[in-house]
Amino acid sequence: MAAAKPHMNLAVIGHIDHGKSTTVGRILFETGVVQQHILDGYKKEAESKGKATFEFAWVMDSLKEERERGITIDIAHKKFETPKYNFTVVDCPGHRDFVKNMITGASQADAAIIVVSGTEGPMEQTKEHVFLSKTLGINQIIVAINKMDAVNYSEEKYNEAKDKMTKLIMSVGFKPAETPFIPISAFCGDNIKEASANTPWYKGPTLLAALDLFKMPDMPTDKPLRLPIQDVYTISGVGTVPVGRVETGILKKGQKISFMPANVTGEVKSIEMHHEEFPEALPGDNVGFNVRGIAKNDVRRGDVCGPIENPPTVAEEFTAQVVVLQHPSVLSVGYTPVFHCHTSQTACMFTELNKKLDPRSGQVKEENPAFLKAGDAAICTITPTRPLVIETAKELPQLGRFAVRDMGMTVAAGLVLSVKAKQMR
């Protein structure tokens, strides 16, 4: 059996009508995941509803209500293969709530395709998505300039959209020289799998070929062990078994570990994945591990396991770069929403608004602003209302990102810049 191809999570991001779902549907069709007869069924249904161009999008939007509205709501996971990688597509809705899923889900994307319409170019929302992608740790992107069929495959229109997107991604910190810009028509199939005769002026890779140019993200095995707990079980005859995903470092049998903020220690007796025992677990592995020396009630979801000599950091307070996505009024000092970070959900208070930033350049716009509103980016000091493990995004990005939830929506997202550690006795 050939060794499994490396796996990558791919986010597909874009403004609501720029053809994101259609692009994903087309990729799944061209890679053989979705067969023609299924598509024909979707096509008939789409035509009967007067949405003839939506058949590929319907592959992703398989929920009935979404189909009738023609927009993507929940994140759908679909898998496909290229010669080099196994991809899981995280079809990110052009709606606001995908941010929470992007940060806290297993859907932490390694790379992204940004779909922008050749007829309209980047929109305000495109900026926000690109900025967020960078904020959330996506470092590799492809820009797909879609709907080329609607502009008669005009090189001029392509260049117009490309120039605008070049400026936009540069302002956020992506390097245009390392970013493929590809003219496509997801609906007609141009430059998805085969080079299109309609764009003889374009000499670069097709979309599927460009996906194989992505570099595999580094496995953070050299970092200290950090394993956020999802659940804790008691198994008779075995004992206490915490379950979670290794984010960084290596979990080893026989290792002495500590759980924070619970502040308890134990020793790893055994490690299990898919009902098989393993001597160690690496980043990305979802494991159950039996720990000697702790009882079920000692540890809970949201705790983080680390080596006894380098335990996870419990924050007294932390400073973070925060982007406000949506808020019905304004956000000011004293605001205490719920922060979702790794598996933890903890109410935290904004105790200081230090600097307001220009979201496009990152430059300081205002010192100590009185409030923040939707669309603002800022550096803030935040105090958890109860002990919380959080690390700096620079050292351990997997534990340094968070989503801020309130009133049933994601109001903000951010990255931890520094942590003032709480002394644990």
Curated annotation (Swiss-Prot):
Catalytic activity: GTP + H2O = GDP + phosphate + H(+)
Annotated spans, G1: 14-21
GO cellular component, one term: cytoplasm
Segments passing through the bilayer: none
SUPFAM superfamilies with a match to the protein in the record: EF-Tu/eEF-1alpha/eIF2-gamma C-terminal domain, P-loop containing nucleoside triphosphate hydrolases, Translation proteins
Alphabetical list of InterPro entries matching this protein: EFTu-like_2, G_TR_CS, GTP-eEF1A_C, P-loop_NTPase, Small_GTP-bd, T_Tr_GTP-bd_dom, TRAFAC_GTPase_members, Transl_B-barrel_sf
Top-rank taxon: Archaea
MF terms (GO), sorted A to Z: GTP binding; GTPase activity; translation elongation factor activity
Main location: cytoplasm
Boundaries of every tr-type G domain copy: 5-221
Residues the record lists as binding Mg(2+): S21
Chain spans, region G5: 185-187
Residue numbers spanned by region G2: 70-74
Chain sites annotated for binding GTP: 14-21, 91-95, 146-149
Keyword GTP-binding: yes
Top EC class, one word: hydrolase
Family annotation (Pfam families): GTP-eEF1A_C, GTP_EFTU, GTP_EFTU_D2
EC number: 3.6.5.3
Positions of the UniProt region annotated as G4: 146-149
Region feature G3, mapped onto this chain: 91-94
Family recorded in the similarity comment: Belongs to the TRAFAC class translation factor GTPase superfamily. Classic translation factor GTPase family. EF-Tu/EF-1A subfamily.
Function: GTP hydrolase that promotes the GTP-dependent binding of aminoacyl-tRNA to the A-site of ribosomes during protein biosynthesis.
Name of the molecule in the record: Elongation factor 1-alpha
UniProt lineage: Archaea, Methanobacteriati, Methanobacteriota, Stenosarchaea group, Methanomicrobia
Primary gene name: tuf
